[in-house]
């Protein structure tokens, strides 16, 4: 799994395409802001859909195969997307994002099935560390490529790197499960996903809470910079706030996951969601440098507490034959704010700017309280393997590499 995380870091470094997508569409491609926004929104829907449904491919065909296929499709499209006419972008961009979402859910599923229960918090923390470190390096590298060559080369570089990630993953990930449990020839007798979820109401409460809090959490990328600008703060202040978030997470998330590994997961998650709400509550009195820093510190510590723990909790409660679909549900919930936060937050900020931060604080607090209440609900017990092989879900063959 460490080798997979190395590949995730490399792939994250070059995943800068969609950071500069809006600039490329409104600049070299000559689209209006409205057209660029529509394309970006459609791409975001594709990403969320890929996260929500990618686990099904992994459960049926194998998580390794899902990762390789998703990376191959996404990389191939990105290599040629700069050459496509505008009309074709309405199909190519959401398809590339959908495939990227499948890769994201497959990465999580591979960590879930490759790390023993009890160690998954640390495993997912390592994965998040690799991803966050790559995203820290990627944007300035992308800016250099765009300045030295052109924005079109960003897509080529991203596409080639994604294809190389697929080749690398094919070499380092075994094509069979190292640990296998007896299972029938097919998973026809396995309970349906709905039945598995009904048997785990605490997981359902958690997923709903994550959708709510992600809508709140991602306001930092949409309405927060507008709010700061309206109160006289320039882009440098916002940039430093985001840097605080990234730096603290890189430094503290891994040791925190290790130190808190024996703490009750729902208590940790609930506390993290409450911290997210507390952060936005700091903005209610008004905008100042102190309140902005308080917001970001509270958001960051809330993220450290809930994101890794929630991912591991869902993995620990998933039945083996549906691990991919459980990870897909969490992955989709955890990124849903990327589509929901900008339009909903922007509309509320335009109509009633004084209500945005109080409502964000209340929504996150209610999500946190719901998770804390869910501790009294049955959360299910992960079942024996009744589907694909435990590690990758791929047929046995000689280990590559």
Model regions and ranges:
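Cytoplasmic helix-loop-helix junction between adjacent transmembrane helices
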Residues: 94-131
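Residue-level signature of mid-helix packing/kink "hotspots" within the transmembrane helices
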Residues: 44-48, 52, 135-136, 246-254, ...
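Helix-loop junctions at membrane interfaces in 12-TM secondary transporters
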Residues: 82-93, 284-295
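Juxtamembrane intracellular "pre-TM" segments in multi-pass secondary transporters
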Residues: 1, 174-206
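Structural signature of the two symmetry-related core transmembrane helices
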Residues: 65-79, 159, 267-281
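Helix-to-loop junctions at the C-terminal end of transmembrane segments
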Residues: 50-62, 252-265
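Helix-loop boundary and gating motifs at the non-cytosolic
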Residues: 1-44, 202-241
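Conserved MFS/SLC helix-loop-helix module at the cytosolic interface between two early adjacent transmembrane helices
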Residues: 49-85
């Amino acid at each position: 799994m460490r080798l997979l995380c190395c590949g995730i870091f490399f792939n994250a470094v070059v995943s800068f395409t969609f950071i500069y997508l809006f600039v490329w569409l409104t600049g070299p491609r000559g689209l209006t802001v409205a057209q660029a926004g529509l394309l970006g929104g459609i791409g975001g829907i594709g990403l969320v859909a890929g996260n929500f449904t990618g686990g099904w491919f992994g459960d049926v065909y194998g998580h390794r195969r899902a990762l390789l296929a998703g990376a191959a499709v996404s990389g191939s499209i990105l290599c040629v997307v700069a050459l496509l006419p505008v009309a074709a972008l309405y199909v190519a961009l959401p398809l590339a994002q959908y495939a990227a979402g499948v890769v994201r859910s497959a990465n999580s599923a591979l960590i879930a099935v490759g790390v023993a229960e009890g160690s998954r918090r640390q495993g997912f923390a390592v994965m998040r560390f690799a991803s966050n470190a790559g995203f820290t390096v990627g944007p300035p590298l992308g800016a250099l490529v765009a300045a030295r060559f052109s924005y079109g080369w960003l897509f080529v570089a991203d596409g080639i790197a994604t294809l190389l990630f697929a080749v690398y993953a094919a070499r380092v990930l075994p094509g069979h499960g190292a640990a296998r449990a007896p299972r029938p020839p097919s998973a026809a007798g396995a309970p349906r996903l709905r039945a598995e979820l009904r048997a785990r109401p605490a997981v359902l409460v958690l997923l709903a809470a994550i959708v709510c809090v992600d809508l709140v959490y991602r306001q930092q990328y949409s309405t927060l910079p507008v709010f700061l600008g309206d109160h006289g703060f320039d882009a440098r202040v916002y940039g430093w706030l985001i840097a605080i978030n990234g730096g603290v997470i890189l430094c503290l998330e891994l040791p925190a996951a290790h130190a808190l590994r024996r703490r009750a997961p729902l208590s940790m998650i609930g506390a993290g969601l409450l911290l997210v709400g507390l952060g936005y509550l700091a903005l209610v009195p008004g905008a100042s440098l102190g309140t902005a820093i308080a917001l970001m510190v509270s958001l960051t510590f809330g993220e450290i507490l809930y994101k890794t723990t929630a991912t591991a909790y869902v993995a620990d409660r998933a039945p083996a034959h549906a691990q991919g679909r459980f990870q897909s549900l969490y992955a989709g919930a955890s990124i849903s704010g990327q589509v929901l936060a900008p339009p909903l937050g922007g509309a509320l900020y335009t109509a009633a700017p004084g209500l945005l931060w109080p409502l964000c604080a209340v929504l996150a607090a209610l999500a946190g309280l719901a998770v804390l209440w869910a501790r009294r609900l049955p959360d299910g017990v992960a079942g024996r393997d009744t589907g694909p092989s435990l590690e990758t879900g791929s047929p046995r063959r000689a280990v590559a590499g």
